[in-house]
Amino acid sequence: MKPPSVSVVVPLFNEEENVAILQQEIREALAGLDHELILVDDASTDATASRVVRGAGVRLLRFSENAGQSAALLAGMRAATAPRIALLDGDLQNDPRDLRLLIKAIDDGADLACGYRAQRKDNALKRLTSRIANYVRSRFVGDGIRDTGCALKVMRRECVQAIVPFKGFHRFIPALVKSAGFRIVELPVNHRPRQFGKSKYGLRNRALKATTDMLGVRWLQARRIRADIVSEQQPTSLSD
């Protein structure tokens, strides 16, 4: 069976009011493009799973207990069958209409296309702290990305092998992929205000975890094995 052209991975946690709307938006945005939608329910405590609209190309993965956004993304990426994998949040703040822009960047030669929120629809404090965090992170890990907090990304399937699975890796996908030698581009995308539900992240839990993770990523970058095979020689037989 021929795989789809793109796998769209969406982590979900308590998004009962958003998931059906998001599914419809993704269907409309990717109309005419063969795709699969992988929804990963991170043990939601509301009716998220029952609100998923079942149908062809829709896959629902469910965790038995809450494992976090990184775990949900990893499960979705590993389950993906397409050569291109798209990531976006389930809270409707990412605009699925931007997916084709990032997919085109992959078709044009990039290995990972990252969106950055050109006009963020968050409060002033969140924008300021995010700007500071992005600056510090970019300088420290050297990924050159202005907005790693933007979940909207499309990558070649091969990039998944560069991702070291640890809690919080989703904040450092560009750094991990770039350090493995893949080509990254960043493009402006739309950002929408949250309509339903509440943000799962606060300033405190993001700052402390991100700082610890940043040190770990820097260590991984320094310790990454870099060895390219340039030739292969057949052993000489004893009879020669």
Predicted regions and their residues:
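Structured catalytic core of nucleotide-sugar glycosyltransferases
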Residues: 1-124, 158, 182-186, 227-240
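Hydrophobic helical membrane-anchoring modules
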Residues: 1-3, 142, 166-240
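Conserved protein kinase catalytic domain
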Residues: 9, 40, 74-77, 103, ...
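Residue-level signature of the cytosolic catalytic core of signaling kinases
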Residues: 44, 54, 65, 121, ...
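A general structural signal for well-ordered alpha-helical segments in protein cores
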Residues: 70-73, 99, 129-133, 160, ...
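Short secondary-structure transition/capping segments
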Residues: 73, 126-127, 157, 196-202
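Short, flexible, basic/aromatic active-site loop/helix in glycosyltransferases
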Residues: 107-161, 178, 212-215
